[in-house]
Curated annotation (Swiss-Prot):
Disruption phenotype: Reizer et al. found that mutation of the gene results in impaired growth in the presence of glucosamine. However, Gaugue et al. found that deletion of the gene has only a minimal effect on growth on either glucosamine or N-acetylglucosamine. The gamP-nagP double mutant can still grow normally on glucosamine, but the gamP-ptsG double mutant grows slower on glucosamine. Induction: Part of the gamAP operon. Strongly expressed during growth on glucosamine. Expression is repressed by the HTH-type transcriptional regulator GamR. Keywords: Cell membrane, Kinase, Membrane, Phosphoprotein, Phosphotransferase system, Sugar transport, Transferase, Transmembrane, Transmembrane helix, Transport. Residues 515-619 form the PTS EIIA type-1 domain. The gene is gamP. This is PTS system glucosamine-specific EIICBA component. The phosphoenolpyruvate-dependent sugar phosphotransferase system (sugar PTS), a major carbohydrate active transport system, catalyzes the phosphorylation of incoming sugar substrates concomitantly with their translocation across the cell membrane. This system is involved in glucosamine transport. In vitro, when expressed in the absence of GamR and NagP, can transport N-acetylglucosamine. In addition, plays an important role in the phosphorylation of EIIA-deficient PTS transporters. The EIIA domain can transfer a phosphoryl group to EIIA-deficient PTS transporters, enabling growth with maltose, N-acetylglucosamine, sucrose or trehalose as the sole carbon source. Its EC number is 2.7.1.-. It comes from Bacillus subtilis (strain 168). GO terms for cellular component: plasma membrane.
Length: 631
């Protein structure tokens, strides 16, 4: 049950990042257009309209995020939210309810929570009914067209139900808001719990009600009422920003101090290497407020430090509150947001002295703990720890392929997504995931909870996810078996080896392949062949590493350690093995020229995107490829 609950919360957490991602752009427009900066109302209003419609944006964002980017789910969410809103208004009149506050636009206002509910509903109904087949008479409304229809009806029902339930929930939220707003202890626990949830990626769920629902403020100039700490702050509420202000000293001063402590306690021979990594991580935290590169450098090797870190983060919020500091952000508590939004802050200058004091506390406390308890923070590992291996020499455009290998290959991926700083993956077989390889490829940390993995690759995580999905869509085999060959064999091929072309035909460059996975060399260097016959033979003596289930691709390892992928045709994975016959099995030793695979060339030309066959040397650089002898 815990496994399933964690997976659902993970999915919701990453889905919430879709609408949250638009806030920095809206915040920039809102601030630059404000009176204390450019004083251009048209720019300010362009940003303000996003904040005014946050519930609708959350509805669409959550729906699309949970439905795998499907626009139909987003359309259904728009329709569903509009129906929910009007249903709540009409039910409020029937029930004789009074406006929740003076000037309220709606008698029952669920705010962002209503948008999230509709987003969840639209995504669920999309997954449930997007393939439905209706009676031929109603055939036009089958499949995806049915989703907005069923969402409309369901939203009406949800609206009726919540017209009775939501007023009670709203009273509870208001009571909790008042309690926490007046409680320093409550603020401490908020900040500490928020920080403790970050390793699990569940903090997005935790902060949402605080940022977008708790507390209310009526703009005296417009009469508009907004709720939530973040939205109130940007509407000009001088009391807002209480649940954000402590992040500024933590991210701008304290985490860089942690990075410095890690550098100073590293082994002498490793300080230069560790300095480069930690200084980069510290600057990322200082400027943008992205904390994972620093936090995950010590989280897994010294969990006790992260507990201390989280408690101190709570103390920072308390101290800032005692000095009546109020400051906010649209992205995170880094230096950019600090400077940009300073004009809206109250006692924002206090962040600097508080940050400096706590930076000293963090530095000396972390330094003492690392040395006293001999914690294996970066740069302090011994050779026996197995953590001193250099990161795999993988070209940037090939990283996605190797990460997919480390995750156990395409067949092992049940769900793949990403947020700002981490890949979020659900796998079928956790034992096939190589966490050490993920770290060698650049992940600063890997979190495993049952079948769910989070690999912290920083801000490139989302682009990395897209590259992996592109590779998976092309049906490229990346298996755990292939991974073993990467780690156990030499990375450079034997220069004395001589290869033969695995297929007869015209040799062309990878740039001629009509698939960007190959043409952009995401998987490695090589060439392509336009086949003249349907036979694939072993290019050298070696071993069959893997055969894709649909038999359209073979992973091969030569006796000298050269990895070769032979991918027959483009989009041939969609043929489901039709027209292919394998003559070898995974793990089988073969001789140069031995028949590996036969395929119906005419069938592939008729049913696939192209018969052109990429031959990829997956562990060979462009320079090394020049020395490979082909005949």
């Amino acid at each position: 049950m815990f496994k399933k609950a964690f997976q659902i919360l993970q999915q919701l957490g990453r889905a919430l990042m879709t609408p949250v991602a638009v806030l920095p752009a809206a915040g920039l427009l809102l601030r630059f257009g404000d009176k204390d900066l450019l004083n251009i109302p048209i720019i300010k209003d362009a940003g303000g309209v996003v904040f005014d419609n946050l519930p609708l944006i959350f509805a669409v964002g959550v729906a699309i995020g949970l439905a795998g980017g499907e626009g139909v789910a987003g359309l259904a969410a728009v329709i569903g939210y509009l129906i929910l809103t009007v249903t709540l208004d009409n039910m409020g009149k029937l029930l004789g309810l009074q406006p929740p506050y003076e000037g309220a636009e709606h008698l029952i206002d669920m705010g962002v929570f209503g948008g999230i509910i509709i987003g969840l509903l639209a995504a669920y109904l999309y997954k449930r009914f997007s393939s439905i087949e209706l009676h031929p008479v109603l055939g036009f409304f089958s499949g995806k067209r049915f989703v907005p229809i069923i969402t409309s009806v369901s939203s009406l029902v949800i609206g009726v139900i919540f017209s009775f339930v939501w007023p009670l929930i709203q009273n509870g939220i208001n009571a909790a808001s008042s309690l926490i707003a007046d409680s320093t202890v409550g603020l401490f626990f908020y900040a500490t719990i928020y920080r403790l949830l970050i390793p699990f990626g569940l903090h997005h769920i935790f902060y949402t009600p605080f940022y977008f629902m708790m507390g209310e403020y009526t703009d005296p100039s417009t009469g508009n009422t907004v709720t939530g700490d973040l939205t109130r702050f940007f509407a000009g509420d001088p009391t807002a920003g209480r649940f954000m202000m402590g992040d500024f000293p933590y991210m701008i001063f304290c985490l860089p101090a942690v990075a410095l402590a890690i550098i100073h306690t590293a082994r002498p021979e490793k300080k230069k290497m560790i300095s480069g990594v930690m200084i980069s991580a510290a600057l990322t935290s200082m400027l943008t407020g992205i904390t994972e590169p620093v936090e995950f450098s010590f989280l897994f090797v010294a969990p006790v430090l992260y507990l201390i870190n989280s408690i101190l983060a709570g103390v920072i919020f308390v101290v800032c509150d005692l000095f009546h500091v109020r400051h906010g952000y649209t992205f995170s508590g880094g230096g950019i947001d600090y400077v940009l939004n300073y004009g809206l802050s109250t006692n924002g200058w206090v962040v600097i002295p508080v940050g400096i004091v706590f930076a000293f506390i963090y530095y000396y406390l972390f330094r003492f703990a690392i040395l006293k308890w001999n914690l294996k923070t970066p740069g302090r590992e011994t050779d026996e720890d197995g953590q001193n291996e250099e990161k795999a020499p993988v070209a940037k455009d090939q990283l996605a392929f190797h990460v997919l290998q480390a995750l156990g290959g395409q067949q092992n991926i049940a769900n793949l997504d990403a947020c700002i700083t981490r890949l979020r993956v659900t796998v079928h077989q956790p034992s096939q995931v190589c966490k050490d390889e993920l770290k060698r490829l650049g992940a600063v940390g890997v979190l495993e909870v049952n079948n769910n993995f989070q690999a912290i690759f920083g801000t490139k995580s989302d682009a990395l996810k897209d590259d992996i999905k592109t590779i998976m869509a092309g049906g490229v085999p990346a298996t755990a078996a292939a991974l073993d060959t990467v780690t156990d064999k030499p990375l450079k091929p034997d220069s004395d080896e001589t290869f033969i072309y695995p297929i007869k035909g015209e040799t062309v460059s990878l740039g001629d392949v009509p698939d960007q996975v190959f043409s952009e060399k995401m998987m490695g260097e090589g060439f392509a062949i336009i086949p003249s016959e349907g036979k694939v033979v072993a290019p050298a003596d070696g071993e069959i590493v893997s055969i894709f289930p649909t038999k359209h691709a073979i992973g091969f390892m030569s006796a000298g350690g050269t990895e070769i992928l032979i991918h027959v045709g483009i989009d041939t994975v969609k043929l489901n093995g039709e027209g292919f016959e394998a003559h070898v099995t995974s793990g089988q030793a073969v001789k140069q020229g031995e028949l590996l695979l036969t395929f119906d060339l005419n069938y592939i030309k008729q049913h696939a995107a192209s018969a052109i066959t990429p031959v990829i040397f997956t562990n060979t650089s462009e320079e090394d490829l020049k020395h490979i002898q082909m005949k």
